[in-house]
Amino acid sequence: IYQSNLYEFFRVRVGSLMDQMLLNTTIRENKTNITAQEQIQEIIKEVKRLNLRKDRAYVELMKKLEGYGVKLIDFASAKADEKKYLERYFNHEIMPLTSPTIVAKRQPFPFLKNEEIYAVVVLETRSKKERIGIIPCSNTMLARLIELPGGKGRYMLLEDLILHYIGSVFKGYKVKGKSLIRVVRNADIDADA
């Protein structure tokens, strides 16, 4: 709930402040007597503080879930048999459904949908040029939560598995860095709201 409310706040309120900032950086808001840019800076400071609270609450919740036999894992903490299962699952279920894109100078940047999760990778060509690779992680045909075999309540997120195997999607490139991102668009100009 916190995260979806935060996305909505950024789409609407921060988006509006960004519009104001682009139009005129000197206008001050009546109640606070600060500019749009100063408001955005204050919002970012407060969001960083709130995100730390959210992260602590998440860690606490995940520990409690472990007490009930439910554990969300990353690939590094998977057992050997789980890693084999995840590799097969990726190669047979996920890989055929991926839609990878490579961003280059002569190609337009792909449209990234609002609030969707993307795996992004910095790739290096054989001639040492950098490219950006992007894979959408949302897929209506696949569950976001992957249940590991054995019925022990162990799960992995789809986007984490895609990020782990992203190098096998972009064969012929060296992976220099990778991350998951989510785009939150300004509600005033969002084409896919």
Label each region the model flagged:
Residues 1-193:
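N-terminal non-catalytic structural scaffold regions of very large proteins
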